[in-house]
Amino acid sequence: MKTVHIEVIHEGEHCIPCVYMALVVEEVAKDYGDALTWEKVIITKKEGALRFDELAQKHGGLPPVPSIYIDGELVFDMTPGPDILREVLDRMMQPKHDSKEKF
C-alpha cells in the first residue's frame, strides 16, 4: 500500500469550514496508521504562507481555503464526508492501473 500525505489548507481556528475539514481528515487518518500523514497548512503563519505560495505557483492560482491536497495535488475544494475521503484514499493507495484516473 502506498503512503500518502494530506495537507489541509487552513486559515485558522476562526474559520469554521477549515476546522471542520481538518476534523474530517483527523478522523479518517486514524484508520490508516503509518500509511497516511497529514498536516494543517495554516496560511496566516509564515511556514504555511510559504507552502500556500508554493502550491499557488505550482498550480497557477491560489488554492481554495479550505481545501485538501493529497501528495501535492488538489483533490477537494469542499469538505468531503469521511466515507468519500476514505474511498478516494483507498483508490490512491492502490497500485495505479490507469495513470489518467480522476477522482
Regions found by a protein language model. Give the residues of each.
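N-terminal leader/targeting and pre-domain segments
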Residues: 1-4, 97, 101-103
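Local sequence-structure signature of Cys/Sec-based thiol-disulfide redox active-site neighborhoods
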Residues: 1-32
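Generic structural signal for residues in well-ordered beta-strands
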Residues: 6, 38-40
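Short histidine/acidic/glycine/proline-rich micro-motifs that form metal-
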Residues: 11-15, 42-43, 75
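Generic recognition of short, well-ordered alpha-helical segments
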Residues: 19-23, 50, 80
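Thioredoxin-like thiol-disulfide oxidoreductase module
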Residues: 41-63
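Conserved beta-strand/loop subsegment of P-loop NTPase cores
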Residues: 67
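Non-catalytic, surface beta->alpha helical segment in thiol-disulfide oxidoreductase systems
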Residues: 70-100
